[in-house]
A protein has these predicted regions:
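Compositionally biased terminal segments of proteins
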Residues: 1-217
Length: 217
């Protein structure tokens, strides 16, 4: 994350960092297990088509190249570090896809200091959970065991006690969507069976299920 933020330079002020690479920044429990390492960094940009493509040109000028080995159309690679960078638009018509909670992620982002003079805009924990649940619904295919999106959500539920209060203060539409997604999980017998294997500490499965139940009401 830091290598991408530094490579972007002042361009980073225009994007909001999202996705699995920021999960560790949203964990507030000092005793929580480390989150999974990711191969790439995600960011979203609020811009029209012309501005988005101009921003892509600026990214290329900062030492990034399109990852021609990937079929992910938003993927870049930082040539010096080799770190992958997915730059996504908020508006779905620009690249043909988006996430319905990206606008909320941009609206509620906050600055966070990574140290050594590097500051980024970080999505909120509520936006993280909402976007990840949306992604799981779209590409997860109900595969609990192999979904990094679901794993990321469970890590935040486990490692951020204040998430309950944050969700309670979220917009009604988002709160209802998240609650519905959690309700579908808790009533799924297969999910209950595999939950201990999805988290770093299987002994916390009951606590996580309890929190999921409370969020789904």
């Amino acid at each position: 994350l830091r290598s991408i933020a530094e490579a972007l330079g002042e361009l980073r002020e225009q994007v909001v960092f999202v996705g699995g690479a920021v999960a560790g920044l949203l964990i507030t429990d000092p005793l929580a297990d480390p989150v999974r390492a990711t191969r790439y960094v995600d960011a979203v940009l609020e811009a029209n088509r012309a501005t988005f493509h101009r921003f892509e040109e600026a990214v290329a000028a900062r030492g990034f190249a399109r990852d021609v080995s990937s079929d992910v159309i938003c993927r870049w690679v930082h040539k010096e570090s080799g770190v992958l960078f997915d730059l996504m638009p908020v508006q779905p018509e620009i690249l043909g896809f988006s996430n319905r909670w990206y606008p909320y992620a941009v609206e509620t982002a906050a600055a966070i200091d990574l140290g050594k003079g590097v500051t980024i805009k970080l999505m909120s924990a509520v936006a993280f959970v909402a976007t990840k649940l949306e992604a799981f619904a779209g590409r997860g295919g109900g595969d609990f065991m192999n979904s990094h999106d679901l794993e990321d959500v469970l890590n935040i539920i486990d490692g951020r006690e204040e998430l309950a209060a944050e969700l309670a203060a979220a917009p009604v539409e988002l709160r209802e969507a998240v609650g519905h997604a959690f309700a579908q999980l808790v009533k799924n017998f297969d999910f209950a069976n595999v939950l201990p294997g999805l988290i770093a500490d299987p002994e916390r499965a009951d606590l996580i299920m309890e929190r999921l139940n409370s969020f789904s009401r």
